[in-house]
């Protein structure tokens, strides 16, 4: 299965394992909660889906790469203790708590979450001295003489032997005690993730043209050449940073991430073209409705790769505009909820002044943000946005003693926030219409239009925006696309 299917399967398993009956006992006893063994190529996102599942299920996550551990850190250190058996005193060996299990209890204390996932990566690549410990871990859910706490689900991951020479195959006795899930690299599924993570538009456009270069592992006379999903994501971050600093992205830099000489050379050439198209076509001008005449003339003569790149640039530019709208709307909605809460407090009345009530609310928000940071249930960007909102609310703290006047003072910042949102929504609507004007004039209802509409359909920012601000032409072309796709499917069925 692909990584998206694996994520859903693991998430469903977590929900099933943590489901309790009316007595508060787990419906599936811990003894029958088989560990999950995830086997797949390196760099396809096994660790990332664990983080996503933990956030979505609102549980804790402890993640370990077991190859970084010795037997002592996994099992614990030995110590001698005196004990009596049958009236005789003996010296026996016991062990301190495993570092891994200790980290689970530490995580529980930090987050206040009693349930979670223990994710152990590269479990089939451990040293010979640690191999028996890993078998005991999978078979008995123990490290040394300590059991994994109840409510904690074991997910282990490893690579197939063709990707790692250090791999040790598990025997049937062990495999019969786990749920093995085999995962393969899938560009279509990864593309959805890449859009959500805002990977660089040049890389996404390149992979639309060269999907076979998404994941490659080859051995030749120069050694192993490889390209992984992780490489594309890390390269994207570097390109953004280099562009901000006006540093050129060379073939050698790309090769450090995409360790395949032909692919690195091809990506470098495409990046140069992509930036040239950015300058030549003037995407911001197109989205503002100001298209130069020579742009259409050039497109009519352009090859398919260039036309496809322009569509990608247009979609990427539109995404940037719509993302600002969505973020501003989320901020406005959150601010509105806090104001409703403050208004309710003022109506109910307390023994504090309106200013003190407002400060109390801000302190509660700060505590909530701190708790979210501890639990890791939201990412850093969301935490940063929450903190910025709290600071802006603090700047609009009321000073009036009369509740009605105090609320009016607190509401001033919100009114400004709402005005900014209205302006951005209008800009988003205009950019959407300008984009369709350009697409119709340049490509009609050709395959480029199909690609553009498909990009919008898969773009989370566009989906959220269009739900609030419908665009007639998007609905028209999307309906035509759905009808055309269904018609082809029916014809294929009849031909069979």
Q: Residue locations for each model-derived region?
A:
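Arginine residue identity/basic-tract feature
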Residues: 27, 32-34, 55, 71, ...
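Phenylalanine-focused residue identity feature
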Residues: 79, 90, 95, 119, ...
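Terminal-proximal interaction/regulatory segments of ATP-powered molecular machines
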Residues: 300-496
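Alpha-helical lid/collar subdomain of P-loop NTPases
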Residues: 196-352
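Charged/polar, solvent-exposed surface patches and flexible loops
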Residues: 8, 12, 16, 55, ...
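AAA+ P-loop NTPase catalytic core and its hallmark functional loops
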Residues: 1-212, 217-220
């Amino acid at each position: 299965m692909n990584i998206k299917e694996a994520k859903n399967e693991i998430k469903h398993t977590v929900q099933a394992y943590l489901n309790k009956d009316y007595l508060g006992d787990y419906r599936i006893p811990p003894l029958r909660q088989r560990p999950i063994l995830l086997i797949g190529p390196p760099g396809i996102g096994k660790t990332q889906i664990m983080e996503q599942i933990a956030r979505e299920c609102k549980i804790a996550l402890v993640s370990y790469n077991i190859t970084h551990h010795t037997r002592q850190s996994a099992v614990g250190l030995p110590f001698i203790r005196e004990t009596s058996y049958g009236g005789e005193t003996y010296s026996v060996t016991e062990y301190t708590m495993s570092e891994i299990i200790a980290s689970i209890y530490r995580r529980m204390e930090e987050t206040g979450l009693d349930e979670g996932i223990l994710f152990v990566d590269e479990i089939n690549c451990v040293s010979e001295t640690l191999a028996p410990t890993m078998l005991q871990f999978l078979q008995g859910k123990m490290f040394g003489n300590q059991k994994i706490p109840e409510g904690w689900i074991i997910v282990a991951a490893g690579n197939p032997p063709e990707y790692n020479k250090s791999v040790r195959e598990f025997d049937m006795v062990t495999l019969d005690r786990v749920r093995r899930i085999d995962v393969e690299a899938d560009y279509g599924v990864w593309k959805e993730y890449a859009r959500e993570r805002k990977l660089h538009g040049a890389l996404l456009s390149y992979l639309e043209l060269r999907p076979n270069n998404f994941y490659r592992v080859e051995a030749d006379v120069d050694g192993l050449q490889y390209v992984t999903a992780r490489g594309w994501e890390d390269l994207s971050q570097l390109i953004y940073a280099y562009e901000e600093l006006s540093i050129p992205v060379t073939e050698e830099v790309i090769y450090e991430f995409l360790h395949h000489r032909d692919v690195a050379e091809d990506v470098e050439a495409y990046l140069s073209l992509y930036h040239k198209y950015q300058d030549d076509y003037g995407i911001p001008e197109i989205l503002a409705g100001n298209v130069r005449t020579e742009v259409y003339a050039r497109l009519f003569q352009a090859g398919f790769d260039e036309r496809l790149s322009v569509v990608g640039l247009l979609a990427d530019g539109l995404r940037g505009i719509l993302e600002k709208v969505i973020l501003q709307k989320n901020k406005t909605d959150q601010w509105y909820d806090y104001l409703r809460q403050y208004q309710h407090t003022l109506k109910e009345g307390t023994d504090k002044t309106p200013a003190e009530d407002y400060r109390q609310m801000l302190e509660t928000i700060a505590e909530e943000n701190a708790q979210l940071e501890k639990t890791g249930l939201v990412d850093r960007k969301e935490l940063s946005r929450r903190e910025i909102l709290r600071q802006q609310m603090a700047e609009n703290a009321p000073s009036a003693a009369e509740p009605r006047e105090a609320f009016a003072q607190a509401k001033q910042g919100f009114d400004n926030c709402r005005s900014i949102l209205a302006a951005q929504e209008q800009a988003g609507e205009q950019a959407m219409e300008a984009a369709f004007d350009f697409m119709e004039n340049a490509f009609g209802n050709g395959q480029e239009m199909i690609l553009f509409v498909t990009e919008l359909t898969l773009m989370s920012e566009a989906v959220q925006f269009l739900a609030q601000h419908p665009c007639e032409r998007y609905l028209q072309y999307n309906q035509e696309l759905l009808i055309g796709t269904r018609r082809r499917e029916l014809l294929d069925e009849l031909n069979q």
